[in-house]
């Protein structure tokens, strides 16, 4: 049996009222500028930006369901990061052959199927692992 990586992006649990409020690529334009503009626009319209987002009730049941679906080794490594691109490096470092991704986005890349043209980021890390032959399979939930 090979090694698997379970990767959870917490946006999987966030419901968004307005589809335009999504986040796409990790860079200053989206992470800082875009969200700051959204915040100011909401303030100008006397709206609370927090009202556009809701935490799913599934978050309370998630780990119990995961424990029933997966078998974990006692020596499992757990990593927490502010960027999902860390999963790319973890999969390579631990010679994983399968990724199980829980995410609101597929993380297969949006700009091109030529992964050698781009550095790894939160939106393409899984696509790069597949394209480079690092992993054999990916399950996206």
Task: Please place each PLM-identified region on the residue numbering.
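Conserved alpha-helical scaffold segments that buttress catalytic/binding sites
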Residues: 1-141
């Amino acid at each position: 049996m090979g090694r698997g990586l379970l990767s959870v992006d917490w946006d999987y649990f966030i419901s968004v009222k307005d589809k335009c409020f999504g986040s796409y690529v990790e860079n200053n334009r989206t992470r800082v500028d875009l969200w700051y503009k959204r915040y100011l626009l909401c303030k100008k319209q006397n709206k609370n930006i927090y009202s556009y987002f809701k935490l799913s009730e599934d978050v309370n049941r998630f780990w119990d369901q995961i424990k029933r679906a997966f078998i974990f080794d006692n020596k499992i490594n757990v990593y927490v990061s502010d960027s999902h691109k860390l999963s790319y490096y973890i999969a390579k470092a631990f010679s994983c052959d399968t990724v199980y991704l829980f995410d609101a986005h597929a993380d297969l890349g949006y700009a091109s199927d030529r992964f050698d043209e781009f550095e790894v980021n939160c939106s393409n890390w899984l696509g790069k692992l597949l394209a480079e032959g690092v992993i054999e399979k990916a399950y996206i939930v």
